[in-house]
Amino acid sequence: MSRYMQRPENALKRANEFIEVGKPARALDTLQEVFRIKKWTYTWSEAVIEPIMFKYLDLCVELKKSHIAKEGLFQYRNMFQMLNVGSLENVIRGYLKMAEERTEAAQQQSSQAILDIDDLDNLATPESILMSAVCGEDAQDRSDRTILLPWVKFLWESYGQCLELLKVNSHCENLYHDIAKMAFAFCLKYNRKMEFRKLCEKLRKHLDDISKVSSQTANVSISKPETQQLNLDTRLNQLDCAIQMELWLEAYKAIEDIHGLMTLSKKTPMPKTMALYYQKLAMVFWKAGNQLFHAAALLKLFQLSRDMKKNVTQEEIQRMTSHVLIATLAIPLPSAHPEFDRFIETDKSPLEKAQKLAVLLGLQQPPSRVSLLKEVLRLNVLQLAAPQFQNLYKWLEVEFDPLNLCSRVQGVIEEITADENSPYTQYTQALQDVTLVRLVRQVSQVYQSIEFSRFLSLAKFANSFYLERILVDCVRHNDMQITIDHRNHSVHFGTDLSESQREDHPDGPTLQSMPSEQVRSQLVNMSVVLHRAIATINPNRKKADRERLRNQMVKNYEENMVKDHQRILQRQKKIEDRKEYIERVNLEREELEQRQLEEAARQQKLAEMRRLEQENEERERKRHENEIQMIKERNMKDKIDQIKQSASGQKLLKKIDEEDIKKMNAEEIAAKEAEERQKERKAHDNNLKSQEKKIDYFERAKRLEEIPLIEKYLEDKLVQDKEFWEKQEASRIEAAIAERKNAEQVQERLRRMQADRDVFWQKLKGERSNAFAEKLKVFNAALEEERRRRLAERVIQRREERRQKWLREKEEERRRIEEELRKQREEEERIERERRAEERRIENEKQRVIMEKQRAKEEEIERKLAEEKERLKERAPRGEKEERGGGGGGGGAWRGRGDTAAPAESAAKPESDWRNAREAREPAPESAGASSAAAPAPKKDGVWQPSGRFREGRGAPGADRPPRGDDREPPAAAAGESKWRRGGGGADDDKDDGPRPRVGAGDRGPMRRGDGDRDDRGPMRRGDRPPMRDGDRPGMRRDDRGDRREGGAPDRRDFGGRGGDRRDDRRDDRGPRREGGGERGGDVWRRAPQEDRRGGAAGGESGGNWRNARQAEPAKPREERRGGEERPKEARAAAGPDEDGWTDVKHHR
């Protein structure tokens, strides 16, 4: 492993470089370091790690390193099983897909290796013959063992690793079951029976593990319905594969698992699942040789199909009932002594085994042949079955006709076997056995002895050995008294009168009792006859006893009637109370469980969120630390690479451990390198000096001493070789002489047999030549016939190919035309979409231009309002001088510059004259100019009060207010208050331009006329407001107000806690208002007249009204409109100022 940590991107690039130069093992090691180093593995996202993982698994598959792939998969699961389950699923599925593709390629390669034979005429080469003789395998088996089996083993290990990886993870539960089904398909495809057994055991162990209680919230819980359904589907697939592979023990275990899962589930399984379960269970019982439970399973399947399946045809019902009936009739007759099995040492008794099998079928007790026949009759199966099977039931279970029994049953069996695809063929042997046992029982009731040949003629489908075995089995299992006399060729029945055959009544048709049965029941019959005689002699005795007993019972009933009735009622009440209590307890328990589940889910969610937050923080911290560490290690790596370039540096790095290198810095390593280089130089010098002394003396002396020894050894070797050759030559000559003599003797013996050999050779040659000629003639005829047949097939095949080619061309032409039409439609739709998009773009451009013009106009308005405000501030001193010169005017009331009326004159004017105030002011342009100039100026303590919004005394903000009209008397006038209290007594006091602001609720409290002693500041005049502090808000402009609501509702304002109304309080539900004071739409505001702001008439500054520039048409006079009529919204927007100088301003949101 490398000493240095690389970034994942660099590791992937490095691995690709190794792959390009043909070193996949080095590439795998490079990628493996990414998952081994855990410092920063959890800091990277799946977008970085997932490509590395795919390349890592690809290399593992290529090199068949399943254990290395397992290590990487476990690390990847720990990283992303909580963050991105989809990435983990993609990685595992990709890994298994790669392994399956490689295995299929190996299988094709193995098959191709057999076809790639050089000489087809000489298939059996000497090598193949020797290999088949040694190992007992053919060429295909050997090819599979060398090419296919390694990949099959790798794929099997991959499936097992993935199942172990995902066995307890609830997030990957679907993937776990998909892999299990893929493993079943793998075992079925490659016929791996041993692996299938191991897989079943592994899945069963996993199911046991998840059935245990676990405290981890991410684990799989068997109590969830989804988990139960997934396991049930997997076990059904397992059962199907086991049946196809004929592993009946594994199929039975799978059935037990399926039954356990269905029992564990709270809801009833689907009928389709139950039908499949009973069908497979019946097949397993039949393969196990248990015909009784096989018939019971078919009966349960019939009941389920009839009750649950809709639109069942009559043919299907007849087929199912016939199957049930014939399976029930094929059950062997029960043994008279089943307790014999208890003498056999087994783990469980037959009764326990039968009870266990009955539980799999949902039965309370094990079935029997008699009970199944009764159930068949009760469910009307006999009447719904085919007629021939109804007759079969009548012949076997009802009628007593031993002479024609086998012949009748033989006809039904021949009818069944005539159809090769009939599902009833498997029952023929069992029906023959049952028929023969019935025949033996019926013959035993008719004959005491019968000739064996006569008995064999009655059994149409049995031979002598088979019939003798049936007789022996009847004696063993059914406790019949049968003796076979082989000397006289006869059979005797019921010869021992002292032994009875069975105590219970035998099933099936009977004619009379056996002699031994009559002897056994003699005392019982005597007792019955004596009781009848006593009843005949004294018939009243029993009647009197019955009457006395009846009276006693009536008396007891009358005495205990009320008590028993009350006891029954109390019992019923207790039962009802108990039911209600149980229901209430169950309901409370369910609610408690639901609350606990919700609380657990909430806690789990919170814990998961906290965990994710902690992981993110930890990941960020580690990432920061890793970046710093990587910078340090990169510098260290550069230094070490420089040191590696020298031989001394390489030796130094080999001597130092990895841990020591991590603790050292670059300077220390350089010092170590210099020290090591100095040591090597000294050692090299010393070595040269010592070698210089040894070479001249030791080598020359050694060579001089060994020269005579070598010469002596060569002389001795020459003498020994000569003696050995002489001995071998003498022995060879002797053996050749002996072989010559033996060959001459053999030649003399064989010369006497030469004539006989020639005769035998000529005879054998003639016989073989004739046989060869006959075989050659037959072969040539067959060859000619096969040639004609293949030529005819080739003609038909070519004709069909031409026809299919014509059909394909026709279909392609049709598809081409449809494709052209589709493209044409798409082109038209695209042109239409582009046209609509262009129209929308042009419309949007128009709207944008309009909005820009409107925005420019609003900016112009704001600029003009600001200039007007500056002009008002400049004229404020002159207005104060004119007000002082004009008199008090009511103590602080606001007046226009053109208002010259005296205060006394204003006070003397009656307040009921307020309706005519507007008509009196209209001819005075100077007064109107002064009023309009003063309109935006009212403030209270530095806070702008919107003119004409609320009037004092109109109720609390947000309350329902009556609509304001011109004919309603102002509240202040009705109460006798002065106009000074309402905020001014100038010429604009009684103009009905909208709701008035609430004045008098400021910091000073309500101010009354003549209350000068309570206010030290004196009378308030225009411009005498106190200086503004930093926290005070300046007067608000009209364009500073927010959007108005739809429907004309007024704005809601919050004036900074100075007593004003909040934005959410100022509702106005008064409805439409007339003339200038009426409400406009939600986006239309009223603007005061702007001409002659500096005291002039309509002449001086009238050009500054931009609304007048847009509309040259004069406003419609008030007299020409009806009273209370409000101009339409469109007319107001385009008409300009009205007769009072007010203008509708459109507010854009």
Swiss-Prot record:
Which residues fall in a coiled-coil region? Answer: none
The record's Gene Ontology cellular component field reads: eukaryotic 43S preinitiation complex; eukaryotic 48S preinitiation complex; eukaryotic translation initiation factor 3 complex, eIF3e; eukaryotic translation initiation factor 3 complex, eIF3m; multi-eIF complex
Q: Where in the cell is it found?
A: Cytoplasm
Would the keyword Acetylation be found if you checked this record's keyword annotation?
Answer: no
Which stretches does the entry tag as region Disordered? 496-515, 811-1149
**InterPro entries in the record:** EIF3A, eIF3a_PCI_TPR-like, PCI_dom
Q: Where is the composition biased (Basic and acidic residues)?
A: 811-885, 908-924, 961-970, 1005-1095, 1113-1132
At the top level of its lineage, which domain of life is listed?
Answer: Eukaryota
What sequence ranges are listed for the domain PCI?
317-498
Q: Is Chloroplast set as a keyword in this record?
A: no
Q: Where are the transmembrane segments?
A: none
Q: Where is the composition biased (Low complexity)?
A: 925-937
Per the record, the GO terms for biological process are: formation of cytoplasmic translation initiation complex; translation reinitiation
GO molecular function terms noted in the UniProt entry:
mRNA binding; translation initiation factor activity
Which family does the UniProt entry place this protein in?
Belongs to the eIF-3 subunit A family.
Protein name per Swiss-Prot or TrEMBL = Eukaryotic translation initiation factor 3 subunit A
Species of provenance: Culex quinquefasciatus
Q: Which gene encodes it?
A: eIF3-S10
